[in-house]
């Protein structure tokens, strides 16, 4: 929910305080003491916010406030407390009477930081700057060392793929490798691992050996099928006239058979034509 506002802030005065306002606030607190800061403006007759009255009193109007810069002892105290508490200025101011948290913070930012850096001390960690710089450089070195193996891991698969493709081309031959390129394209050739490549190479050698054996067996069977019948050429010199007569007889018989077939077929055609013409007349 958050803290409720101290007042409505309607018709209240803003800006720097006047001497009369400071006098009213000092007289009220010295006579009545510190009470609820929300009620102080109404009781003292000030047109200010309760928070503004509190800050004006604690930072400027308190009688126990110390004016001026911090002493060497106070600076050492602030450095020791800052190394333990960090930027908790209100807690640091509680250990330094007469000093406000705002005053200590301003003095830290304007004076103490510069002194520590000149002494070679980091104002945030209170360690020597050389050690802090080394600690800052170590993560960068780790990042650089991690990026080099990452680049190597990205380059190794590319080299392996190129080697695998060259081995595949040697094992399959130019024709089959061109068929793969036409089907998939150069960029779409599937990546093949080394184990599968060894299997492909062994299968290709086995298939080549089986294909050569099958070709040889097919050739032998084909030659067996093409074996021609043996002819007896006995008494070739003595029976030339008989062979010539036999050949002449075969030719004459074939010519007669062809003539008889063609003759009968032509007669059938003539008979069919005559029958069709006679039926057409009647």
Curated annotation (Swiss-Prot):
Please give the coiled-coil regions recorded for this protein.
none
Signal peptide positions on this chain: none
Note the superkingdom of the native organism: Eukaryota
Q: Principal localization?
A: nucleus
Domain named HTH myb-type is located at 9-61, 62-116
Tissue-level expression: Expressed in chalaza of mature seeds, cotyledons, rosette leaves, cauline leaves, veins of stems, mature siliques, sepals and styles. Expressed at low levels in roots.
Query: Which compartments is it annotated to reside in?
Result: Nucleus
**Inducing or repressing factors:** Induced by salt stress, drought stress and abscisic acid (ABA). Down-regulated by salicylic acid (SA) methyl jasmonate (JA).
| UniProt KW keywords | DNA-binding, Nucleus, Repeat, Stress response, Transcription, Transcription regulation
A single GO molecular function term of this UniProt record: cis-regulatory region sequence-specific DNA binding
Residues annotated as DNA-binding are 37-61, 89-112
Query: Mind telling me which CDD domains this protein's record contains?
Result: SANT
Q: Which SMART domains match?
A: SANT
Gene Ontology cellular-component terms for this entry are: nucleus
User: Which Pfam families would you find in this protein's record?
Assistant: Myb_DNA-binding
GO term, biological process aspect, one: positive regulation of DNA-templated transcription
Other remarks?
A: Plants overexpressing MYB20 display increased tolerance to salt stress.
What name appears for this protein in its UniProt entry? Transcription factor MYB20
| Species | Arabidopsis thaliana
The gene from which this protein is expressed is: MYB20
